[in-house]
UniProtKB/Swiss-Prot annotation:
Keywords, sorted A to Z: Host-virus interaction, Inhibition of host innate immune response by virus, Suppressor of RNA silencing, Transport, Viral immunoevasion, Viral movement protein
GO biological process: symbiont-mediated suppression of host innate immune response; transport of virus in host, cell to cell
Taxonomic lineage from the root: Viruses, Riboviria, Orthornavirae, Pisuviricota, Pisoniviricetes
The name this protein goes by in its record: Movement protein P1
Record carries keyword Transport: yes
Functional description taken from the UniProt entry: Transports viral genome to neighboring plant cells directly through plasmosdesmata, without any budding. The movement protein allows efficient cell to cell propagation, by bypassing the host cell wall barrier (Potential). Also likely to act as a suppressor of RNA-mediated gene silencing, also known as post-transcriptional gene silencing (PTGS), a mechanism of plant viral defense that performs sequence-specific inhibition of viral mRNAs expression. Silencing activity has been seen in Nicotiana benthamiana and Nicotiana tabacum, two non-host plants.
Amino acid sequence: MCEPPPGFITVQCYTSDDLLTGDSTIVKSIPVRSCFFRQGVEVVLFRCESNKHRWSKIRGPVSLTVHCDICEFRETVVIPSLPKGFKVSSDFSYSVTWNCCYSRGRTE
């Protein structure tokens, strides 16, 4: 049995202005230990809009679905809310497939 290293999903929010500057706001880093990450960290970018004049209108939650084909495991992690002053510009869901820790067969 192999032990996959812990991986993190780094969720970043970008606005229209950020497209010009290349900046983005890190929303949250979520540990996902169920799957084997190819590079250790997966960065998820989604579009959001800064709403500085209406701070109370923050949309959430944002759902990320992680599934692994080899071990047929599926996990959904939820970001409770966005930072103050940001909202998702449209309904957002993100699904991604990573390589699992392959526990069957020969292990090194």
